Structures are given as structure tokens and as C-alpha cells.
Amino acid sequence: MKRIVLLRHGESLWNKENRFTGWTDVDLSEKGVEEACKAGDALREAGFSFEAAYTSYLKRAVKTLNCVLDRLDKDWIPVEKTWRLNEKHYGMLQGLNKSETAVQYGEEQVHIWRRSYDVAPAPVGKDDPRNPGMDIRYAGVPDSELPRTESLKDTIGRVMPYWKCIIFPALMYKDSLLVVAHGNSLRGIIKHLKGISDTDISNLNLPTAVPYVFEFDDRLVLVKDYYLGNPEEIRKRAEAVAKQGMAKK
């Protein structure tokens, strides 16, 4: 049996403040660090051991991965970081409060920006500090590939080449891999693995720091997928994610 575990980072400071984060490099909150450690504990108690790990260029994912590997005593395994696993770029929405944005534009429009498949928010300008082209960490990435806004479709377009060429083929010679990334980059991978339609993907909300396990047979055919944890608690946390784009009553 082969396994890949997908893990969204722990709560970030902007998750706590209910702000659109995207490619903004926001740190974990105190709660987020605790969530990451608990995810590592849950994986250890369930007997998981990883041979390699993958994450984004953003510290909230990197630090979550470090917490998990520390709990597993696997700090030494190979780790690859890539911009392709970054969160969806939210364009001009980055930094705005989601509830306040829902008051201004309506909950339906915010839901479309957050969860639709092919609608992107307005892009940031070329000289805007939110443009990844202004960030030295992306100096090696062609400017034409760096987004100034993205839909989920756009996000999948940059995630999938890395998934298909790097991560998934690694299962041919490794048995267990860990991917720590972001809500939308992981939603794209899950959409691909489970064959979720462009319409139904809007209903998928990933809670922070809950391991999502995918098991494959020796032919790399998906045979089982499940969250690791208490189903009722996970359901409530996913519902809380869905409500982030609602106006405060």
C-alpha cells in the first residue's frame, strides 16, 4: 500500500483575523502552532512515517511541516519547497477582511471569489507589493508564470505539473509522502484525485491542520481516502471555513 497525506497549514494570523491571505507570507498564530503539533501527534499515534515531504514557499506551510516532522522525529527526511504549492493568489482582495468584503459586495460574490472554479478577483498592479514579481524569493520564476490574481482553475494549472511530474511519480519508489500546503492548492489536488466536478468543488472546504490520507495500491490506483481525526469535530471545522465569507450579523 502507498500513501500520500495532504495537510493544510495550521491557523495563520490572517486566518484568525478572517482576511484574504493568498501569497502574503503570514505567520502561524499561536493556535496554528498548536494545531500543527496536534496533527503531528495524530500522525505519530496512527503509525505514519514519511520518506519525503513537499511544501510551498510560504512560512505558514513551512512551519506547519516543521512542527509535524518534529513530532514524528523525521526532521531529517528530504523536503522540497516550491512556489507551485502556494495558496491561490487573491489579487486585490489580499489583506481585506472577508466579512467586511461580504458586506460591501454581497455574500454570493465573495463565495464566487473564494470557491468558484474559474472566476478570479481583480488583479493587483505590476508595481503593487502584492505582486509576486516584487518578491525576491520568486526571482528564479519567469515573470510570465507569476500570478497577480488567480481562480481555482488557474491555481490547478500551476499545481498539476508539479504534482504529475514530481510528487505522484515519487510513489513508484517511496511508500509514504507528506504534502503540506494551502486550502486551494490542496483542493486542486483533491479535485484531480477524486474526479470532483468543476461545480461540486465549490462545496469542498478544508479545515486547518487535519491530515487527509489517500491510499493507493501498487499500481497507484486510489483505493481509499479519509480524514484522520474525530469526524464530528472535522465537520464543524470545515463548516467554520465555509462561513468565513459571510457578513457578520
From Swiss-Prot:
The active site is at H9 (tele-phosphohistidine intermediate), E87 (proton donor/acceptor). GO terms for molecular function: phosphoglycerate mutase activity. InterPro entries: His_Pase_superF_clade-1, His_PPase_superfam, PG/BPGM_mutase_AS, Phosphogly_mut1. The keyword Protease does not apply. It catalyses: (2R)-2-phosphoglycerate = (2R)-3-phosphoglycerate. Gene3D superfamilies: Phosphoglycerate mutase-like. Pathway: Carbohydrate degradation; glycolysis; pyruvate from D-glyceraldehyde 3-phosphate: step 3/5. Keywords: Gluconeogenesis, Glycolysis, Isomerase. GO terms for biological process: gluconeogenesis; glycolytic process. The record marks H182 as: Transition state stabilizer. SMART domains: PGAM. Substrate binds at residues 8-15, 21-22, 60, 87-90, 98, 114-115, 183-184. Its EC number is 5.4.2.11. NCBIfam families: pgm_1, PRK14115.1. Catalyzes the interconversion of 2-phosphoglycerate and 3-phosphoglycerate. Belongs to the phosphoglycerate mutase family. BPG-dependent PGAM subfamily. This is 2,3-bisphosphoglycerate-dependent phosphoglycerate mutase 1. It comes from Bacteroides thetaiotaomicron (strain ATCC 29148 / DSM 2079 / JCM 5827 / CCUG 10774 / NCTC 10582 / VPI-5482 / E50). The gene is gpmA1.
